[in-house]
Amino acid sequence: MWGRAVRRRCPRGLRRGREALLALLALAGLGALLRARSRSGTVDPGPPRTPLPGRHEPVLPRPPLPADALGAHGEAVRLQLQGEELRLQEESVKQHQINIYLSDRISLHRRLPERWNPLCREVKYDYDNLPKTSVVIAFYNEAWSTLLRTVYSVLETSPDILLEEVILVDDYSDREHLKERLANELSQLPKVRLIRASRREGLVRARLLGASAARGEVLTFLDCHCECHEGWLEPLLQRIHEKESAVVCPVIDVIDWNTFEYLGNSGEPQIGGFDWRLVFTWHVVPQRERQSMRSPIDVIRSPTMAGGLFAVSKRYFDYLGSYDTGMEVWGGENLEFSFRIWQCGGTLETHPCSHVGHVFPKQAPYSRSKALANSVRAAEVWMDEFKELYYHRNPQARLEPFGDVTERKKLRAKLQCKDFKWFLDTVYPELHVPEDRPGFFGMLQNRGLRGYCLDYNPPNENHVEGHQVLLYLCHGMGQNQFFEYTTRKEIRYNTRQPEACITVEDGKDTLVMDLCRETVPENQEFILQEDGTLVHKHSRKCVEATEKVLDNGFAPYLRDCTNSDNQRWFFKERMS
């Protein structure tokens, strides 16, 4: 438990004896009692307590809206535009990668449909005993309506007794509407503070500006284009009240960037993972986790988090070393923090009763050139020898300047964190760990068609299977040209999750991708012979580099075996 870790590892000033701890708890209880007096005029009779009427009222009441208002109850809006209006909408998408033209026409106070498990409504909270939170929202050149809708959503769904403040951190925006106009608007709202960076900091350091100024016991980080579901805050704070070393994420519901439809789901949420490119991925909850749950609304352990929305004890955040300040833009920082939470004694969880809608932009609205360096820092500090699996699939990452990680490694040693093998074995056993045997991974190059390699680039990142494997000029950058020949005689395309294996369907001669199986089917087995011949076990035919008939490109096909160099293949780890 983290409590033991604090006594064993924290500085002397934080080591308290049993008497001091009891005194501290007594003071906390007295503080809660005084707050109860000042807010309600009555004194609770003492434990066991039940929530008092009215104690969960939000900071601001939500104003009534017409039932037919645009986007009411999270409904999709599809405007029929033409001429100048259509041009303005397209311009807003180009600038923000979100349909801001539509967002500006949807109320800042719209209600969302109920998208949580009905059991969540039955949960009772002891509001006087829950910690108060500071909600930190960093932004850079955000559109007016999406930013203000986020702020109002927090104020109109968060119990007043639980919300210490909302801290908006302006990361050196240069848009006119985010200057005096924003300051004037926010000055009229209760519990809202605006902090402005004096230079462009990037998401990580901007969030740290907010965290350092926060007065709440819990830090709740949100992105700047969110809408909070009713009852989103209480489950996060309740869980941290129960276990201070738990970092808790809400269920992230999608808000469509174009129609602003709220696509929440009351069913089982997904959890976070990653692939060996160190790209965050979503996954279904594994059976082992389901078996440990007593109720469908129990917290769900997650190997990683998306990173934009989570709550953490401020004290525990500081103990863990907060964010890695060597990181700037978003990307990679979420995996680094996820690894650190787990390896250093905490838990990372998703709470099914906490839902927050998030507008996922069409694509990133600004450059994230330093995201690769973030991933390299995460690999260097936390992944031990497994970082080589990342570098094999991202050769360019070896050349990426990533700064000094000496202090982060000292932090890992100070906190006596576990190794990455423990993380893979204990936290994420579902992730396949590649073998990467020398001479059997990298670019699979053809000997006859010189300079051409197997290449697979599915059009949909979320559906890796079902498309033909092709041949393109070797580029040496891994990714879509990285393959591994395993001891199970598979040719794995394992840069992404879920992993895919080259397959030949019965009666056909084209090589396509299908999901790898626990037991290797015959149509996924290939024999790589010493002379480089690649034989498909089921058909007994050889893989040959062949010109495609329709588009003059090249692709591998099954052909009767010959002595042709076009049927000989070899792995090459990097471009010479």
UniProtKB/Swiss-Prot annotation:
SUPFAM superfamilies tied to this protein: Nucleotide-diphospho-sugar transferases, Ricin B-like lectins
Signal sequence region: none
Binding residues annotated for substrate, in chain numbering: D171, R200, W330, Y366
Membrane topology: Single-pass type II membrane protein
Broad EC category: transferase
Gene3D superfamilies, sorted: 2.80.10.50, Spore Coat Polysaccharide Biosynthesis Protein SpsA, Chain A (3.90.550.10)
TM segment ranges: 20-37
Alphabetical keyword list: Disulfide bond, Glycosyltransferase, Golgi apparatus, Lectin, Manganese, Membrane, Metal-binding, Signal-anchor, Transferase, Transmembrane, Transmembrane helix
Gene Ontology process terms (BP): protein glycosylation
Region (Catalytic subdomain A): 130-239
Region of interest: Disordered: 38-58
Amino acids binding Mn(2+): D223, H225, H358
Function: Catalyzes the initial reaction in O-linked oligosaccharide biosynthesis, the transfer of an N-acetyl-D-galactosamine residue to a serine or threonine residue on the protein receptor. Has activity toward non-glycosylated peptides such as Muc5AC, Muc1a and EA2, and no detectable activity with Muc2 and Muc7. Displays enzymatic activity toward the Gal-NAc-Muc5AC glycopeptide, but no detectable activity to mono-GalNAc-glycosylated Muc1a, Muc2, Muc7 and EA2. May play an important role in the initial step of mucin-type oligosaccharide biosynthesis in digestive organs.
Protein name, UniProt field: Polypeptide N-acetylgalactosaminyltransferase 12
Naturally occurring in which organism (per UniProt): Mus musculus (Mouse)
Lineage start: Eukaryota, Metazoa, Chordata, Craniata, Vertebrata
